[in-house]
Amino acid sequence: MVNSNLAYQDIEIEIPQIKDEPVKWCSVSLSDVIARGKRLEASVFDVEAKQAWQTVINNRFGIKYLGTSNGLIDNAYYPGRFKRIYCSKGNGVAFYLPSQMTDVYPKPDKYISKITKCSLDELRLKAQTLLLTRSGTIGTISYVSKTLENTVFSDDVIRVTFKDAVDLGYTYTFLKSSIGQKILTTNGYGSVITHLEPEHLNEIPIPNAPTDIKQRINNLIIDSYRLRDESNELIDSATQLLVDELHLPDISEFEVDDYKKEAPVETFNVKLSDLNGRADASYHLPIVDAIINHLRKYAEEVTTVGDERISSDIILPGRFKRVYVDKEYGVRFLGGKELNQLDPSTEKYLSKKAHANQLKDSLGIKPNSLLTPARGSLGEVVFPPKHFIGWAISDNLMQILSFDSICGYLYIFLNTEYGKTLIQRFTYGGVVDAIEPEHIKQVVIPLLKNEDVQKQINDFALEANQKRYKAYKLEQQALDIMDNEVIFAK
């Protein structure tokens, strides 16, 4: 009896492992201390930023400053500010925001009227230009390739051109590196910059690497963006094949059955038998019926996402307490805003140990899957490339598990305006829009009469994703060269 008492048993105590982290330090001049109110707390000074500046200044190749007369930059500017007059799609020019700058294939959400008092030519992006955000989340980097060329971006984006073409990809890679990001978003004293101006680039040091290293890095970035452009062209080709096969008109040209066409708001009748338990008008919009009727006319079969031929499951992770860790101990944690980026900018990493089961079951991104928001801005669909596999998604995202033979085709259809409309019809909620897996299962999907065309669409989407994966690997290779052969080279 006594021996069975837990109080008398030896209990093996697990000694916690203490992570051995290097001490963060830097030297601070007396003038810096006085300038910051004579405060001596380390938090007042960004130690990592000061170390980043010192690392670059002391690199083996010496430095140049980006924007001086002897620097790399030819011109850095942003258009003048103007009052934006927004309008509908058919009456304006597609207008992109800084948050879309890093998307693999940005799609415009806003359109500005042609009567807006601004120079559209000045707002249009020119090829071979480096882009920097100057306010909000400063320091975001992008490169104008074929996809972004001639698009109209806001005045919140700084446009940078270079004297030598080789310096464009080289500077892009440096500023995107962890050291470059620290330097771009702070000054030499380690103070965080809240607003970036072109003049600030004059003070930024960059390693003066040999031309052959610059050329290697620049070529990798050029090839990376070429592959992104090619992937976008494949998506466009697949979409056009789908539109042609189903004889789909522009979504604005569908004839809808409005009750009173002259009414100031859209009005329509709904039969009691068609309510389906939904009394919200958005579920019964006539455009939805018009799209479905058109698909039934031209498709071989109209089924739903929940069809076992289309998907094996639709997963929405449950709410959970997140355990964040350093990069080396976790997996990337993606929210909705990072999904369209090739190299997501998230700095959050979920613990591999604490979330092992969840990563395996519901949080980890699976092959041949599609991702779509379950809360917030609904209707968008993402086809995650290979390097996303195994990363974690938030509990505000749903994962559609599909098959290699159909997942690309499924993405192409859902990525169209027609697919987005069919998803959004299931929206519910008051303050925050929401949608559930059961709703996604009911979204209509057409199967084509011509199976060869359907396979070609699927193959184009898969090939596009493969090109995006290769583009990601090339950029990572350029970043590795920058770190190992330039910044930290002995």
What are these regions (language model features)?
Residues 63-84, 99-127, 303-321, 337-367:
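Sequence-specific dsDNA recognition surfaces
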Residues 151-158, 190-212, 390-398, 428-453:
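A short glycine-rich beta-alpha junction/loop motif
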Residues 1-82, 210-320, 451-490:
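Non-catalytic DNA-recognition/assembly elements of restriction-modification systems
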Residues 134-173, 335, 360-362, 371-413:
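A short beta-sheet element
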Residues 101, 105-107, 116-119, 131-141, ...:
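Well-ordered mid-protein domain cores that form the structural environment of catalytic cofactors
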Residues 85-93, 102-105, 109-111, 123-125, ...:
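Short, surface-exposed loop/turn microsegments at beta-strand edges and helix-strand junctions
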Residues 119-120, 147, 191, 359-360, ...:
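A structural connector/turn signal
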